[in-house]
């Protein structure tokens, strides 16, 4: 039986193509393998849940929201460290996300280094 390496993939879920591409490029520029999805449902339908080490997810998405995705993954016993990003810094939503296990909640626009520090911390989980 082969020993499985710890997953290192950073999955990015954001419906804004510019944000998605920028975050994907940022992750790859520092050596993190990354894959971007436009919708939560696209990520769920992919075969990448098991090798995802960190999720960067927009709170507000068409269809399933970022919080709904977090809830579904928790219900399916996936424990993927999740960093939420949003243009709407609602404290109630922030607390809900953190109580459900999010490792960070960043309000757009955010500093690239703040996001990278959060990703590095998530990969250490």
Model-derived features with residue positions:
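Short amphipathic alpha-helix used as the core "switch/output" element in two-component signaling
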Residues: 67-78
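The feature encodes the CheY-like receiver
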Residues: 62, 90
């Amino acid at each position: 039986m082969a020993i499985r390496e710890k997953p290192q993939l950073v999955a990015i879920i954001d419906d804004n193509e510019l944000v998605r591409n920028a975050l994907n490029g940022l992750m790859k520029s520092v050596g993190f393998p990354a894959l971007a999805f436009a919708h939560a449902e696209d990520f769920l339908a992919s075969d990448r849940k098991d090798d995802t080490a960190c999720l960067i997810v927009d709170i507000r998405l068409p269809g399933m929201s970022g919080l709904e995705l977090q809830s579904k993954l928790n219900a399916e016993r996936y424990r993927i460290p999740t960093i939420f990003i949003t243009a709407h810094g609602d404290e109630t939503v922030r607390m809900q996300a953190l109580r459900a296990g999010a490792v960070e909640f960043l309000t757009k626009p955010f500093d690239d280094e703040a996001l990278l520090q959060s990703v590095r911390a998530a990969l250490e989980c």
